[in-house]
């Protein structure tokens, strides 16, 4: 059994931030459970483009409001607490935060914690070390 709090993750290597966002990576590939689980915060007034070509991501919005745009077909979705979106087709997408948004995110395959978005918003596929 694994039990963690966001307080114990804050300020560690599992607490990752970039311009306009912060991700507390609660479960990572090294935990050996087949997925990773993150609490991600996106700052109000920011826009981010992502394209997870190697991962499927599920996102559950728990706080804030914004929009999600599927960049393959320009369809726009409103985001508010209680909204879930699943990028099961590896869709290139844009997230715009009207207010600060807090989301719970699941990645499969799991991220290791070492990934950094490249210039196209892509995480590389990083092998999970054998434990």
Swiss-Prot record:
CDD domains: cupin_EctC. The keyword Lyase applies. Its EC number is 4.2.1.108. Keywords: Lyase. Pathway: Amine and polyamine biosynthesis; ectoine biosynthesis; L-ectoine from L-aspartate 4-semialdehyde: step 3/3. Catalyzes the circularization of gamma-N-acetyl-alpha,gamma-diaminobutyric acid (ADABA) to ectoine (1,4,5,6-tetrahydro-2-methyl-4-pyrimidine carboxylic acid), which is an excellent osmoprotectant. Gene3D superfamilies: Jelly Rolls (2.60.120.10). It comes from the Bacteria. Belongs to the ectoine synthase family. One of its GO terms (molecular function) is ectoine synthase activity. This is L-ectoine synthase. NCBIfam families: PRK13290.1 (NF009806). The keyword Lyase applies. GO terms for biological process: ectoine biosynthetic process. It catalyses: (2S)-4-acetamido-2-aminobutanoate = L-ectoine + H2O. InterPro entries: Ectoine_synth (IPR010462), RmlC-like_jellyroll (IPR014710), RmlC_Cupin_sf (IPR011051).
């Amino acid at each position: 059994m694994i039990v963690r709090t966001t307080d114990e993750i804050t300020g560690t290597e599992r607490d990752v931030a970039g311009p306009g966002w912060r991700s507390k990576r609660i479960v990572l590939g090294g935990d050996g459970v087949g997925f990773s689980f993150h609490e991600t915060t996106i700052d109000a007034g920011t826009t981010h483009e992502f394209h997870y070509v190697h991962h499927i991501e599920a996102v559950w919005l728990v706080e804030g409001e914004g929009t999600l745009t599927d960049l393959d077909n320009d369809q726009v979705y409103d985001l508010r607490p209680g909204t879930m979106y699943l990028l099961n087709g590896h869709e290139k997408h844009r997230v715009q935060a009207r207010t600060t948004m807090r989301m719970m995110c699941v990645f499969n395959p799991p991220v290791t914690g070492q990934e950094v978005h490249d210039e196209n918003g892509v995480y590389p596929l990083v092998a999970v070390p054998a434990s």
